[in-house]
């Protein structure tokens, strides 16, 4: 029997959901401890523990790179730690006590003008102030300046020069369909107002009440902000005064499964939803 040369053996990788006789010769139907890369098959290097030295259980991890400085920030249930490439430092807020985060809700993180802002849905949002344009491990997290009292949000995201709070609780009353945005922030500063009743700032609120389910999360997509409820998706567009933002329903049937289940890539958003996974191109899901 003659040998048949097969090239580009890593072109397709492992394909399990198509019948083997329908696949090209250089596709694999099964494999263990291998990975396809550069049109070749390589041995998988396995796993390497990277948080062994972290002083707390790393329920949430995010990266911040500002002015040449690179930090890994870990959110635990009660504290926040940062790693500067050498050591771990506790940057939990100095006043207000430990946090009340839960494993179920967890944290969200966003960056506005180089300032890291985190929220867990149970405490006031936290921000890491800059010193000479960069954060310092000696600086503690603190309750977000100008944030309204007795108010929490399940997710907090940056969009343009604004902070967008999603699924808001006011004085223990949940407004699960409420979108609340700040006034525009100055460079390397947090917004100075969240007062939706003031005519002198751009802060405002809008309730997405024409569909079922609660607001889960949101992320910018090119020039717009996508808001994901449990079973629907909305587009938030900047229109300026007097309304500041306009809201349009993008999908009445597809939302997001949970917080941090949306990721941006070159073609749009990759969304984990109930029962399936979707691509949000900005025009449709």
Model-derived regions, located:
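Short glycine/acidic-enriched loop and turn motifs that connect beta-strands
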Residues: 123-124, 169-173, 278
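N-terminal beta-propeller domains
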Residues: 1-89, 148-235
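Short loop/turn segments that connect beta-strands within beta-propeller blades
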Residues: 84-86, 130-133, 239-241, 283
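Beta-propeller fold detector
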Residues: 90-94, 136-145, 192-195, 245-250
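Beta-sandwich interaction modules
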Residues: 96-113
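Beta-sheet-dominated scaffold domains
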Residues: 5-10, 211-285
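Asp-box/WD-like beta-propeller blade repeats and closely related beta-sheet repeat scaffolds
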Residues: 130-157
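Conserved blade-register residue in beta-propeller folds
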Residues: 82, 127-129, 235, 279
């Amino acid at each position: 029997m003659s040998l048949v040369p097969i090239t580009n053996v890593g072109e397709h990788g492992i394909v399990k959901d198509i019948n083997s006789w329908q696949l090209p010769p250089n596709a694999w139907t099964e494999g263990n401890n291998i990975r396809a890369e550069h049109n070749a098959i390589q041995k998988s290097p396995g796993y390497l523990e990277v948080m062994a030295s972290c002083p707390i259980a790393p329920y949430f991890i995010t990266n911040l790179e500002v002015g040449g400085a690179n930090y890994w920030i870990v959110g635990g249930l009660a504290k926040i730690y940062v790693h500067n490439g050498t050591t771990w430092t506790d940057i939990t807020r100095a006043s207000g006590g430990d946090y009340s985060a839960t494993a179920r809700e967890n944290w969200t993180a966003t960056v506005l003008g180089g300032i890291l802002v985190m929220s867990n849905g149970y405490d006031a949002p936290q921000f890491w102030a800059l010193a000479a344009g960069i954060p310092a491990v000696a600086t503690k997290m603190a309750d977000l300046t100008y944030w309204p009292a007795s108010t929490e949000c399940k997710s907090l995201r940056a969009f343009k020069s604004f902070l967008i709070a999603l699924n808001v609780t006011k004085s223990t009353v949940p407004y699960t369909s409420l979108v609340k945005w700040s006034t525009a922030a100055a460079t390397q500063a947090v917004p100075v107002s969240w007062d939706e009743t003031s005519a002198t700032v751009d802060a405002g609120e809008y309730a997405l009440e024409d569909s079922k389910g609660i607001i889960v999360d949101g992320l910018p997509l090119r020039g717009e902000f996508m808001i994901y409820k449990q079973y629907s998706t909305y587009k938030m567009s900047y229109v300026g005064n007097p309304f500041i933002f306009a809201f349009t329903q993008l999908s009445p049937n597809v939302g997001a499964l949970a917080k941090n289940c949306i990721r941006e890539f070159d073609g749009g958003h990759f969304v984990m939803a109930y029962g399936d996974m979707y691509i949000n191109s900005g025009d449709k899901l």
